[in-house]
Amino acid sequence: MATGSLRGLAVAGGGESSDSEDDGWEIGYLDRPPQKLKGPLPIEEKNETFKKALTTGDTSLVKELLDSGISVDSSFRYGWTPLMYAASVANVELVRVLLDRGANASFDKDKQTILITACSARGSEEQILKCVELLLSRNADPNVACRRLMTPIMYAARDGHPQVVALLVAHGAEVNIQDENGYTALTWAARQGHKSVVLKLLELGANKTLQTKDGKTPSEIAKRNKHLEIFNLLSLTLNPLEGKLQQLTKEETICKLLTTDSDKEKDHIFSSYTAFGDLEIFLHGLGLEHMTDLLKERDITLRHLLTMRKDEFTQNGITSKDQQKILAALKELEVEEIKFGELPEVAKLEISGDEFLNFLLKLNKQCGHLITAVQNIITELPVNSHKIVLEWASPRNFTSVCEELVSNVEDLNEEVCKLKDLIQKLQNERENDPTHIPLMEEVSTWNSKILKRTAVTVCGFGFLLFICKLTFQRK
C-alpha cells in the first residue's frame, strides 16, 4: 500500500450510524511509518496515541501500547472497541493481534456486532474473508442480527462477497432468515445485482420463493432493479446448483470453498451454469446428471426425452428408477389444456340461446387468456441474445412454431367470421319472418301501458279510502 494513501473510512458498518457526531477518531485509515513510544505517557495521551495507531494501522505501536497496560477492549467515545474499528477497515493483522491479546469477538454496540462490521467493511473480499474467518474462529455468532434484523450473511450478500457468504454458511449461518422488510440474503444479492452471490446462495440452498413484506420474490426484486440476467436466472423452474452444498458438513464445505484453487473452481461453476442447455438443466434438477453423456451420445434432445414412450426409455438404457423420476417431473411440467369438453354442446338443435351465448363467452375468455400469455412472453423475453442465461435451440425451431401459430390464428379468424355471418343471417331472416311471434318482453303496446297505469291508480285510490275510513272510526 502506498504511503499516505487513504485506505478506508471508519464508519459504522452495515449502514448503522454512530451515536455521536464527535467520536474521537481520525476518520480514515492512513499508511504511515511505524512509530515507537518515547517514554511513559499519561492515560489520556496514551488513549489518543492508541487511536492514532489503530487509524494508521501501526501494528507494532498497537502491540507496544497493549504491553504498556492499555485495555484491549477499550471503549471509545461512541462505544466502539479497537477490534470493531480494525474489522471495519478489514485490517487483518490488527484483527489478529487484538484477538490474540484477548479482544472480545462477540462484542456488540447497539446490536451492531463486530462480525457484521467485518462483513460490511471497506476492503477487498480477500481481506474481509480473512477477518471474518478470524472472528468465526473465536466463536463469533453468525446469526446475531442488527437493529434492522440483518445478519452478517445479508451484509456480505448485499456487498457482493460470495466467498464470505459461503464461509458464514459453513459456520452455521441461516441462509433463509429474513430481516425487518422480509429480505433474505438472496433478496439483497438480487437487489444489488451480484450474480456470483446469487449463484452461490442457490448452491447453498437459498429459497428463491420467499417474499418480502410487500409480496416481492427475489426475482421480482431483480427485475424491478433492472438486473434482467439475475431475473432470468431466478425464474428458472429447475436449478442445477440449488442445495448442492447444503448437505455437506462444515469441514467439507470449508475445504471445498477455501482451497487454493477456489477461484478457478468458482469460475468453472459459474461458467458451466451459464453454458448449460435445456437438457442439462432438466437432468441436474432431477439429480440425473449421470444420464447427460448417455443422452448426448444418442443425440436425444429434451423435446425427444419428454415425448418418449416406456419402451423407448428401456431401449435407450434408461433404468426404471430414472424413468420414474422423469415421468414424475413430466406431471409437474404438464400445461393444463383448455377443457373444451366442458363447453356446452352447440350441435344440438334444441340448445337454448343462453347456452349458446355462454359457449361464445367462454370461447372469447379463452382467447383473451391466450393473448395475455403471449403478451407476457413478449414482455419477459430479453431484447439482446447475450442476456439469455440458458443455451437455446436454433431460433429456426421457434420461428417455425410461431409461423404455425399465425396460420392457426388466421384459420380461427376465418371460422369465427363464418360463424358471425351465419348468426347475422339467422337474425335477419327471423326479423323478416311474418310468422315470427315476438317474445313477451318485446311486446309493449299502448293498451298494456294504460292497463298497468289504471290498475296502479285503482289500488292507490282504494288504499287511500282504507286509511280515511280507519281514521274516521278512531275519532
Curated annotation (Swiss-Prot):
It is found in: Cytoplasm. Keywords: ANK repeat, Cytoplasm, Developmental protein, Differentiation, Meiosis, Phosphoprotein, Repeat, RNA-mediated gene silencing, Spermatogenesis. It comes from the Eukaryota. Its main location: cytoplasm. The keyword Cytoplasm applies. PROSITE patterns: ANK_REP_REGION, ANK_REPEAT. ANK repeats lie at residues 45-74, 78-107, 110-144, 148-177, 181-210, 214-243. Pfam families: Ank_2 (PF12796), Ank_4 (PF13637), SAM_2 (PF07647). Residues 272-334 form the SAM domain. One of its GO terms (biological process) is regulatory ncRNA-mediated gene silencing. Plays a central role during spermatogenesis by repressing transposable elements and preventing their mobilization, which is essential for the germline integrity. Acts via the piRNA metabolic process, which mediates the repression of transposable elements during meiosis by forming complexes composed of piRNAs and Piwi proteins and governs the methylation and subsequent repression of transposons. Its association with pi-bodies suggests a participation in the primary piRNAs metabolic process. This is Ankyrin repeat, SAM and basic leucine zipper domain-containing protein 1. It comes from Oryctolagus cuniculus. The lineage of its organism: Eukaryota, Metazoa, Chordata, Craniata, Vertebrata. The gene is ASZ1.
